[in-house]
């Protein structure tokens, strides 16, 4: 008689974590950061129809990486949750923390109870109302339901380590919009496959949006077209193109003298 297959709970959780992490790493990167006027979202996304960044509610934004169908289900569920809470109580009762907690519960339940975890990582961002001293909030929620209140910026998907390193080196709290877009795009260009290798990230492959704290009700707005082209820094010239060509040796040597 064959023995039944057995795997420890620890091994099952480890396998699920590995599956989710590999799925997330296959995606393109997203950078979310706070700047002087609110929160900026910059995502690598060549598609114009499928969005990785979107609005959740009046002062809330959403960014995600991983499997599109899975994080799209989460996005829509978050919108319904926010609408129901705002309708039942008050619009001010819909906060980033409440949405982040709801997402963490959902992802944690799926991770432990379903055969396959969601291969997603999401960020919920919130800005205060006009004139409020409340600082912007960033919440990172991972595939297993873990939730982290991040300071300053979040990097998700793809090769995150070189991008996060570039962000740590160049981030400042008082950035304006143009400077914030510049350091986010330059950080995404650091996510090459090899050490020191830079990737080509142009305007056509970017999805950019902001939560603008100065807007009176709905803070979310997208930036595209000419407005985005004016914000994105130009690609750095290759070293071979920028270096001056060596001049040919035109100096004449003195003629040999005979004794």
From Swiss-Prot:
User: What segment(s) does the record annotate as region Disordered?
Assistant: 231-259
**Localisation per UniProt entry:** Cytoplasm
Q: Name one Pfam family in it.
A: Proteasome
Question: What's a single GO CC term here?
Answer: cytoplasm
Q: Which domain of life is it from?
A: Bacteria
Q: How is its activity regulated?
A: The formation of the proteasomal ATPase ARC-20S proteasome complex, likely via the docking of the C-termini of ARC into the intersubunit pockets in the alpha-rings, may trigger opening of the gate for substrate entry. Interconversion between the open-gate and close-gate conformations leads to a dynamic regulation of the 20S proteasome proteolysis activity.
Pathway-wise, it operates in:
Protein degradation; proteasomal Pup-dependent pathway
Q: Return the Basic and acidic residues bias intervals.
A: 244-259
Question: Which InterPro entries would you find in this protein's record?
Answer: Ntn_hydrolases_N, Proteasome_alpha, Proteasome_alpha-type, Proteasome_asu_bac, Proteasome_sua/b
How is this chain modified after translation?
Answer: The N-terminus is blocked.
**Where does the UniProt entry say this protein principally localizes?**
cytoplasm
Q: What taxonomic lineage is listed for the species of origin?
A: Bacteria, Bacillati, Actinomycetota, Actinomycetes, Mycobacteriales
Keywords from UniProt, A to Z, are: Cytoplasm, Proteasome
Function summary: Component of the proteasome core, a large protease complex with broad specificity involved in protein degradation. The R.erythropolis proteasomes are able to cleave oligopeptides after Tyr, Phe and Leu, very poorly after Arg but not after Glu. Thus, displays chymotrypsin-like activity, low trypsin-like activity but no caspase-like activity.
PROSITE patterns cross-referenced by the UniProt entry: PROTEASOME_ALPHA_2
Which gene holds the coding sequence for this protein?
prcA1
MF-aspect GO terms: endopeptidase activity; threonine-type endopeptidase activity
Protein's UniProt name: Proteasome subunit alpha 1
| Record's compositionally biased regions (Low complexity) | 233-243
């Amino acid at each position: 008689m064959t023995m039944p297959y057995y795997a420890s709970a620890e091994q099952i959780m480890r396998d699920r974590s590995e599956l989710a992490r590999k799925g997330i790493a296959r995606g393109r990167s997203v950078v979310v950061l706070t700047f002087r006027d609110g929160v900026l979202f910059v995502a690598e996304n060549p598609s114009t129809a499928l969005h990785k960044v979107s609005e959740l509610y009046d002062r809330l934004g959403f960014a995600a990486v991983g499997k599109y169908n899975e994080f799209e289900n989460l996005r829509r569920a978050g919108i319904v949750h926010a609408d129901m809470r705002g309708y039942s109580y008050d619009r001010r009762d819909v906060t980033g923390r409440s949405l982040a907690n709801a997402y963490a519960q959902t992802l944690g339940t799926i991770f432990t109870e379903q055969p396959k975890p969601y291969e997603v990582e999401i960020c919920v961002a919130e800005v205060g109302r006009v004139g409020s001293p409340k600082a912007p909030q960033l919440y990172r929620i991972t595939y297993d339901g873990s939730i982290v209140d991040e300071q300053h910026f979040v990097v998700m998907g793809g090769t995150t380590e070189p991008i996060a390193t570039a962000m740590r080196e160049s981030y400042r709290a008082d950035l304006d919009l143009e400077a914030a877009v510049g350091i986010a795009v330059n950080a995404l260009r650091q996510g090459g496959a090899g050490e020191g290798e830079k990737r080509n990230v142009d305007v056509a492959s970017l999805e950019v949006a902001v939560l603008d704290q100065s807007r009176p009700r709905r803070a979310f707005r997208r930036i595209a077209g000419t407005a985005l082209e004016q914000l994105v820094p130009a690609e750095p010239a290759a070293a071979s193109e920028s270096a001056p060509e060596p001049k040919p040796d035109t100096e004449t040597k003195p003629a040999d003298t005979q004794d």
